[in-house]
C-alpha cells in the first residue's frame, strides 16, 4: 500500500463508519497524463449513486485540508462493480446470499464453473447452494469468485 492510499484510507474510514459503508479498495493510478484516486465502497444491499456522492464530497473536503497529493488528480468514489472478483473475507461476508459464479481450477460435477447462492466461506471451504443443496468446494480449487450477472 502506497503512502497516498494509506493516508486516504485513514481519511475515508471515519466517513464510511459514520454511514455504515465498507471500504472495498483504494487505487491511485496514472492513466496517460492524468492521475486518478479511486475509492471503492459498498454496503449490504449495494451502494447507490447518492451514497457515492456523499462520501466523495466529504472525502474531497478532507483531502483539500490534508492535501496528501501534491499535484492535480481526479477523485472517483464508486461501487466495486459487478466484474470485480470477491477477494477478501469482507467481500464474501458482504455478498453472502447473492448468486455467485465460482470458477474452478479442477472440474467438480463435470464443470469448471458453478453458479449458486453464496452460503459461507471459511479458510478452507467455499459453500454455495445449487438447487437447494449445499456444495462444499475446497478453497484451494477455487480460481475466482464473482457475483453472477442476471438478466
From Swiss-Prot:
Q: Name one Pfam family in it.
A: RimP_N
Q: What organism does the UniProt record list as the source?
A: Caldicellulosiruptor saccharolyticus (strain ATCC 43494 / DSM 8903 / Tp8T 6331)
Q: Which domain of life is it from?
A: Bacteria
What's in the keyword line of the UniProt record?
Cytoplasm, Ribosome biogenesis
Q: List, alphabetically, the SUPFAM superfamilies matched.
A: YhbC-like, C-terminal domain (SSF74942), YhbC-like, N-terminal domain (SSF75420)
Q: Where in the cell is it found?
A: Cytoplasm
PANTHER family (alphabetical): RIBOSOME MATURATION FACTOR RIMP (PTHR33867:SF1)
Write down what this protein is called.
Ribosome maturation factor RimP
Q: Which residues form a coiled coil?
A: none
Instruction: Tell me, in a sentence or two, what this protein's role is.
Output: Required for maturation of 30S ribosomal subunits.
Check the record and name the CDD domains matching this protein.
YlxS_C (cd01734)
Primary residence: cytoplasm
Could you state one GO cellular component term attached to this entry? Answer: cytosol
Q: What protein family does this chain belong to?
A: Belongs to the RimP family.
Please provide the Gene Ontology terms (biological process) for this protein.
ribosomal small subunit assembly; translation
Amino acid at each position: 500500500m502506497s503512502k497516498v492510499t494509506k493516508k486516504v484510507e485513514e481519511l475515508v474510514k471515519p466517513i464510511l463508519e459514520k454511514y455504515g459503508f465498507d471500504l472495498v479498495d483504494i487505487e491511485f493510478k496514472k492513466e496517460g497524463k492524468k492521475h486518478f484516486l479511486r475509492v471503492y465502497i459498498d454496503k449490504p444491499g449495494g451502494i447507490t449513486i447518492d451514497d457515492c456522492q456523499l462520501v466523495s464530497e466529504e472525502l474531497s473536503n478532507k483531502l483539500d485540508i490534508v492535501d496528501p497529493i501534491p499535484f492535480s488528480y481526479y477523485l472517483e468514489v464508486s461501487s466495486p462493480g459487478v466484474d470485480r472478483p470477491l477477494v477478501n473475507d469482507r467481500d464474501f461476508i458482504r455478498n453472502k446470499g447473492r448468486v455467485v459464479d465460482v470458477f474452478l481450477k479442477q472440474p467438480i460435477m463435470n464443470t469448471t464453473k458453478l453458479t449458486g447462492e453464496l452460503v459461507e466461506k471459511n479458510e478452507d471451504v467455499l459453500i454455495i447452494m445449487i438447487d437447494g443443496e449445499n456444495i462444499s468446494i475446497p478453497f484451494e480449487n477455487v480460481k475466482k469468485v464473482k457475483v453472477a450477472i442476471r438478466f
